[in-house]
Curated annotation (Swiss-Prot):
PANTHER family: 2,5-DIKETO-D-GLUCONIC ACID REDUCTASE. Belongs to the aldo/keto reductase family. Substrate binds at H116. The active site is at Y54 (proton donor). Keywords: NADP, Oxidoreductase. The keyword Plastid does not apply. The record marks K83 as: Lowers pKa of active site Tyr. SUPFAM superfamilies: NAD(P)-linked oxidoreductase. It is an enzyme of class 1 (oxidoreductase). Its EC number is 1.-.-.-. This is Uncharacterized oxidoreductase YtbE. NADP(+) binds at residues 194-246.
Length: 280
C-alpha cells in the first residue's frame, strides 16, 4: 500500500517511480511555473511530469534546479518525465526531439520518456528511437501515453522492449477497466493524467458525500482512489496550498464499499481527445 509521498512503484525493468507527482499541463513559462515545481519539490514531491508540446520544459528545468537547492537533495532523488510530440515521431526525428527536451530542461538524462499520442504509422519508428536512448542509458524508463489495447498490441509486434508505462486519461468518469486489466497482465504500469477531470468532478455529490465521511477534500478522495487502484497519479496545481493538500492522501484508506461507489460513477466520458479519433 502507498503509505507516503515518496513511496514508489517498481516498473517491469526494476526502475522505481514515485506513485505521486506534479503535472504541469497548461502551465505557461514564467515565475508561476518555476515556483510550482520548486514548491512541490520542497514539499516532498519527487516526480515532475512535462511534455514538449506544453512549451514549458525550460521553466520546469529552472524549478527543478531551484527545488533541488532549496530542498537539499540531488538530481538522482527526482523522477522527471517528458514526452515526444506527434510532429516529431520517427526514428531520427524522435532522437532529435529528445535532445531538444533534455537541453531545455537542463538535464543530462530523463527518468521517463513517453510517446505522447499513438499516431498511426509513426509510433513504431519513434519507439525504436526510445529503445536506442534507453539502451544508451539516456533514459531510465520508456513508455507511451494515450495508447489503447490495440495500439499496444500493434506496437509490441515490432518492439524489442515492452513499454514500462502507459499514461492515459483516468478519473471516476473514465475508469478504463479493460485497458487497466490488459496493462496489469502485461506488466505495464498505468499512470493517470487529468485525474481530477480538470476540476469538473470537484462538486460531484457522491464524491462530496464520501469526502465528508473522511474529512477530506473531493480531490484527495479521487487521488486516493487512484492510488488504491494501483495507478500512478500526477495532479496539476500551481497554488502552494493545493500542492500540499493534493499530496495529503497517505493518512487514510478508502473502504472497498467507497471504492465501489466511485467506480460506479464511470460513464466512459473524456475531457481529452479520443485516442482512436484525433487529428493533431
Amino acid at each position: 500500500m502507498t503509505t507516503h509521498l515518496q513511496a514508489k512503484a517498481t516498473l517491469h525493468n526494476g526502475v522505481e517511480m514515485p506513485w505521486f507527482g506534479l503535472g504541469v499541463f497548461q502551465v505557461e513559462e514564467g515565475s508561476e511555473l518555476v515556483n510550482a515545481v520548486k514548491t512541490a519539490i520542497v514539499h516532498g514531491y519527487r516526480s515532475i511530469d512535462t511534455a514538449a508540446i506544453y512549451g514549458n520544459e525550460a521553466g520546469v528545468g529552472e524549478g527543478i534546479r531551484e527545488g533541488i537547492e532549496e530542498a537539499g537533495i540531488s538530481r538522482e532523488d527526482l523522477f522527471i518525465t517528458s514526452k515526444v510530440w506527434n510532429a516529431d515521431l520517427g526514428y531520427e526525428e524522435t532522437l532529435a526531439a529528445f535532445e531538444t527536451s533534455l537541453s531545455k530542461l537542463g538535464l543530462d538524462y530523463l527518468d521517463l520518456y513517453l510517446i505522447h499520442w499513438p499516431v498511426e504509422g509513426k509510433y513504431k519508428e519513434a519507439w525504436r528511437a526510445l529503445e536506442t536512448l534507453y539502451k544508451e542509458g539516456r533514459i531510465k524508463a520508456i513508455g507511451v501515453s494515450n495508447f489503447q489495447i490495440h495500439h499496444l498490441e500493434d506496437l509490441m509486434t515490432a518492439a524489442e522492449i515492452k513499454p514500462m508505462i502507459n499514461q492515459v486519461e483516468f478519473h471516476p468518469r473514465l475508469t478504463q477497466k479493460e485497458l487497466i486489466r490488459y496493462c496489469q497482465n502485461q506488466g505495464i504500469q498505468m499512470e493517470a493524467w487529468s485525474p481530477l477531470m480538470q476540476g469538473q468532478l470537484l462538486d460531484h455529490p457522491v464524491l462530496a458525500d464520501i469526502a465528508q465521511t473522511y474529512n477530506k477534500s473531493v480531490a484527495q478522495i479521487i487521488l486516493r482512489w487512484d492510488l488504491q487502484h494501483g495507478i500512478i497519479t500526477i495532479p496539476k496545481s500551481t497554488k502552494e496550498h493545493r500542492i500540499k493538500e493534493n499530496a495529503s492522501v497517505f493518512d487514510f484508506e478508502l473502504t472497498q464499499d467507497d471504492m465501489n461507489r466511485i467506480d460506479a460513477l464511470n460513464e466512459n466520458l473524456r475531457v481529452g481527445p479520443d485516442p482512436d479519433n484525433f487529428d493533431f
